[in-house]
């Protein structure tokens, strides 16, 4: 019962992010004289967050989704450079920190086979987590192709960092760095389940000491049965 309560508490907190985005970007659409490019971008963000919200609600309904075998995935081909830009723009507009949130890549586009909603859920989890521990400075989402041909995503912040002794357990269920920070400590655990199902890996960069850096790799093609 305690685990279910913690799960529901965490999901309630995560649901606030897409809800705030929907409210904020819907308001932008009502701005007089809004240009077409901004209108299209707002519509894209609203659609992405509507899909994310639906997935989160489904997770709340099915608490057993903490078991990767029960998580539902829809694998299709998606362009992820634009996805990253939209996620960063969304969070930059609703952030509760003075830290800058930015996206860095040398890629103009990159298509991968993934579940777009689940990938967005991972990116949002990692970026929102960074805002909790980074009151000033910067939070950077980066995307590149690594030496093995995987898409490598990283979220780097200039916050308080993660003690070395906690880095091996931080992806466990209900693990929290700071008990005073809202949430049940399931966000990173869910990220690990998602990326494992998508054929990748996630880890903490222990060599980065100016804050925290989370890195995950994602294959360009899926080998799993759809």
Question: Which residues does each PLM region occupy?
Answer:
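Primarily the dimerization/phosphotransfer
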Residues: 1-31
């Amino acid at each position: 019962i305690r685990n279910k309560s913690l799960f529901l508490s965490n999901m309630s907190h995560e649901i606030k992010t897409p809800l705030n985005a929907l409210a904020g970007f819907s308001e932008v659409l009502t701005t007089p004289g809004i240009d077409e490019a901004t209108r299209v971008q707002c519509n894209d963000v609203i659609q992405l967050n509507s899909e994310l919200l639906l997935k989160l609600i489904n997770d709340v309904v099915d608490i057993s989704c903490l078991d990767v075998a029960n998580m539902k995935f829809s694998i299709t081909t998606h362009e992820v450079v634009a996805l990253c830009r939209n996620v960063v723009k969304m969070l930059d507009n609703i952030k509760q920190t003075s830290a800058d949130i930015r996206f860095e890549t040398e890629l103009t586009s990159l298509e991968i086979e993934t579940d777009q909603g689940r990938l967005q859920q991972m990116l949002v989890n990692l970026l929102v987590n960074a805002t909790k521990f980074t009151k000033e400075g910067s939070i950077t989402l980066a995307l590149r192709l690594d030496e093995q041909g995987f898409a490598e995503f990283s979220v780097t912040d200039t916050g308080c960092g993660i003690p070395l002794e906690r880095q091996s357990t931080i992806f466990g269920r209900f693990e929290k760095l700071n008990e005073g920070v809202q949430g049940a400590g399931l966000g990173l655990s869910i990220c690990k389940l998602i990326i494992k199902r998508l054929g990748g890996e996630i880890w903490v960069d222990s060599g980065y000491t100016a804050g925290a850096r989370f890195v995950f790799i994602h294959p360009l093609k899926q080998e799993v049965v759809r």
